[in-house]
Amino acid sequence: MGRDEGTRRGDPYWEDAARAYGRSHPERSNAYRDVDPATRPGRDRPARAAPAPRQRPDQRDRIVDPIGQRVRTRSSDGPAHLTPRHDRRRLGALLVGALVLLAGAVGVQQLVLADDGDADEDALFEAPPSTEGAPTSAPSTTAPPPAGPASGFATPGLLTFRGGPTRSYYGEGPVPAAPEVLWSYPGASGGMCAESAEGNETRTWCGSGWTGQPAVFERDGRTWVVFGAYDRKVHFVDYDTGEDILPPFETGDIIKGSVSIDPDGMPLVYTGSRDNKLRVIAIDRPEATELWALDADAVSPTKWNDDWDGSPLVMDDYLYEGGENSQFHIVKLNRSTGADGLVQVDPDLVFNAPGWDDELTSSLNTRQNDVSIENSVAYHEGVIYFANSGGLVQGWDVSGLPDGVEPSRVFRFWTGEDTDASVVIDDEGFLYVGVENERGTARAAEVGQLVKLDPRQPDDPIVWSLADPGGFWATPALHDDVVIAPADGGTVYAVDRQTGATRWTLDLPGPTWQSAVVVDDTLIQGDCDGVLHAYDVSDTTIEPPELWTVQLEGCIESTPALWHGRLFVGARGGRFYAIGDA
């Protein structure tokens, strides 16, 4: 990705991706080698050898047949057989819903925040001196939204990857009817490119990549578009014109993840970079200003590397983030406004924990360090969910934080494969997890690559799963009664959320790493030929008709943001686009 043709061949990650793509689409198995090196897909990983799988003898799972019509169970000591379980699931969901309604009638307890004040950890962080003067604490309005657009945030907009805690909100319509490129960024010729080291090699990266979703939000009567890119910068541009609102904020390396905007109206941007730092940036000054940064090596032990791919989740003055250092972090932000009217923070790392355990590392054998957290954490009913590159999906109960109760792990499930897609949660609390298929492990073959889990059944959580040869890097999207999931090889699946049956598929030039976006019954999906497609998914039972396409430059790995008639997305050709009706 972004290197010369002469160095493209022999790239271990590139060859891993090509092999995965070839498994999914043998007829296009050489397609990667024909893509322009400045625009081709890929991320910053060395080659991964398939570990010898370790299976628990009592493990059972459910796999959807290739035609997607039946759910079957497989155990280690018996053949596959059909199983009815959905009536029990629906009954459980109804009981949970009743309890939620009862709790709402009594009154939902809000998180009350208190600073732990652990002075011993101050030396671990970078922080310029606070603004002097008596602070005014920031009010918190971030009641965690359910699946869908109901946010209740003080800041109107699409504020984090997939919009909110359940990672299931995609923006606001209308969807453009006959769109074209309205502007591209940067305005001058050229693109957003920078060098970044991978192992012992330095190469050029261009544009924006996985996940790379921009944030779009209203501030002081103006609509901002904020995104990180492979030029090492965070950009703050005007919705209408594409001109800089603030000068770009430069970090020390490329930015691969999606930025987050403070949901409570504080002028703060939260973002990580490949330069080791997770930052809090103020935007209420003539220039974007770093207020604080957490170093990836500020906690111990760590594994893998120092990047921050996940989009931070901010709720009730706590920031939740997993890092490629393989740790899960919780930071009390202590946001306030100083006497000079400028925003300030006094962050405190109140909790961190390894994202791995001994059972996982034993299962990974020679790949015991391959446990980075590269997805964006999700939240539902007091529990934070995330997965890691070792395939461990886990849930941590954080409901006791205001009372000083340390978070504890309450859910554990092993997919057997790299799991970088963010966990998506529906309004009944079910989890939808996309799993890659790079190593060909026996465990991944058992579990499948698109999995619906019930965390209330921790000993047997699989509701259904779907197998795909290349697996899923993109985060699935919920739409009505289906989950829409783009696979690495270019197949886009629509799967019945209750039964796991495949309703329809689309075949696009892969890899399709862009997470699907669905607003107003319209699916927005980019492909690796640089084409952004729109499909009518108002009838989820039929293959959707295509409504329009827009050609961009380079593979579309980043997830678009839709806000009030305009789409915003970057591509690997080096530019960022505003797309809408003229």
Model segments located where?
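N-terminal export and membrane-targeting signals
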Residues: H81-A98
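N-terminal targeting leaders characterized by basic, low-complexity, disordered sequences
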Residues: M1-S75
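N-terminal compositionally biased, intrinsically disordered segments and leader/signal-like regions
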Residues: R8, R40, R74, P84, ...
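Extracytoplasmic/lumenal domain signature
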Residues: D120, P128, G133-P139, A143-P156, ...
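C-terminal region of N-terminal signal peptides and the immediate post-cleavage residues
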Residues: A103-T131
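Hydrophobic core
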Residues: L99-V106, T142
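Low-complexity intrinsically disordered segments
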Residues: D36, R60, R70, A80, ...
